[in-house]
């Protein structure tokens, strides 16, 4: 870890960009600045952001940092500006899906998730659901937010989704499946007694 404090020099540029383009995100995938070290910033599994051991409580600041977050091929998370890149720690996923709504779009039923940062994501082919089974055999459900950044579904949202799912045969197995925007997403194989 780099003990020198890192100054995110490009942050003011990002802030002005995000104020002008509320729906757009900075093009962090196009930026290739030098790596400037690690900073003491961490995103907990519950979606709370901490800097130097203190929770960042200003939603606008968390949203700003999340807009410049990138997951690179080395499986590390970085905050990226045009002039520098710093590594942060993420316990699980950087976002948490905290609510779920059923929607009708172009005569198709879909499910709209809202994250802890008020981003809305439609469960679809572009934003699929994935389930990872942990060492404790507990499922961890995720929805793709953008590029390779995911939101962990909160326990209550996952239970709500399971309640909405239907049993279907998938590859000769009975599974709980949720259909959204014409796509089927396998939640879990149903164990028959």
Q: Which residues make up each language-model segment?
A:
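Long, non-globular segments of proteins
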Residues: 1-193
């Amino acid at each position: 870890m780099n003990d020198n404090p890192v100054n995110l020099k490009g942050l003011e540029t990002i802030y002005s960009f995000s104020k002008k383009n509320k729906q757009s995100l900075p093009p962090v995938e196009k930026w290739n600045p030098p790596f400037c070290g690690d900073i003491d910033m961490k995103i907990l599994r519950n979606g709370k952001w901490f800097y130097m051991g203190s929770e960042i409580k200003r939603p606008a600041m968390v949203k700003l940092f999340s807009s410049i977050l990138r997951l690179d091929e080395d499986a590390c998370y970085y905050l990226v500006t045009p002039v520098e890149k710093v590594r942060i720690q993420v316990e699980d996923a950087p976002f948490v899906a905290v609510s779920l709504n059923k929607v009708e779009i172009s005569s198709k039923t879909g499910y709209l998730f809202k994250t802890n940062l008020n981003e809305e994501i439609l469960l679809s082919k572009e934003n699929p659901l994935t389930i990872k089974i942990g060492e404790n055999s507990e499922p961890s459900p995720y929805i793709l937010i953008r590029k390779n950044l995911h939101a962990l579904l909160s326990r209550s949202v996952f239970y709500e989704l399971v309640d909405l799912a239907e049993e279907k045969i998938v590859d000769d197995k009975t599974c709980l499946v949720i259909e959204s925007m014409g796509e089927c997403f396998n939640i879990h194989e149903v164990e028959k007694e």
